[in-house]
Amino acid sequence: METDFFEYSRQKIAKDKATGRCDVANNRGAALKCLSKFLGKEELTFGELSLEMMTQFKEWLNANGRKESTVRLYLYQIHTLYKEAEKEDIAPHLPLLSGIKLPLPSKQKCELLTEEELRRMRYADLSDFRSQTFARDMFFFSIYCRGISFTDLAHIRKSDIKGFTLTYTSQVLTPPIVTVQWDAAMQAIADRYPSATDYLFPIIKSDDKITKSREIGRVRENITKALKLIATRCNLSIVPSLKMTKDIYKRAIDSVSVSKII
């Protein structure tokens, strides 16, 4: 009997959760759940998977009101799981998405805080509200870390820092190993929030994978609320968000002349 794709995928998702890659596990789980609804069953051999099935699955997702970004995410999750099975010689070689058009969303210009607003926010006196001070520090730490995701930020361990280098294992990126320069500004932020655990910041307190994900989500939500209050206090043109930190970092790098560095 051929190996079942759903059973194989569930095992992969369990491994993702066991290694702390909760975001990856959640995305794969959502894609698998939708595929099950489309098929009306939870059994599917690798031999039954086909380009035609993926085309029909895409049409079904579109017909059920899924956004293009969601359709693309789900199809790529199924494709990635299949490719992993290929590498393990469990599934035959098959270009599962060959010919399926998955147009990238049009790149919309993201509104960012101006440099003057960033300075105003950075040096504002927020000492009367610890939650706002913490939110600001996490916002700028994310920028200093090249726009690190909050999930990855929460998972940084003290042992990841060696001298002037931070090397961490990303929960959301592939390849997962990321190295950035560790500087005085980042150290100053870390010093303000001593952690009693192996993690750099006091965000994750549990060893349970599911509880970890909830802790991260709760702190992220509190930061989002605090950033909205900061926007009002600092008279910012837009509300700062953790999602914009990568674009702010890229803008800063793009504005630097290489000839002034080398």
Q: What are the functions of these language-model segments?
A:
Residues M1:
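N-terminal helical hairpins
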Residues R10-D23, L32-K109, A124:
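N-terminal core-binding DNA-recognition domain of tyrosine recombinases/integrases
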Residues K83-I90, S142-G163:
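Short, charged phosphate-coordinating catalytic segments
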Residues G99-F150, A154:
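Basic, Lys/Arg- and aromatic-enriched nucleic-acid-binding interface segment
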Residues L126-F129, T167-I177, I210-V219, S237-P240:
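Short, contiguous acidic/charged loop-to-helix segments that flank catalytic cores in large enzymes
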Residues R130, T224-I261:
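Short, basic (Lys/Arg/His-rich) helix/loop patches that form interaction surfaces
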Residues H155-D191:
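Conserved tyrosine-mediated DNA breakage-rejoining catalytic core shared by Y-recombinases
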Residues Q181-I238:
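Active-site/catalytic core of tyrosine-dependent DNA strand-transfer enzymes
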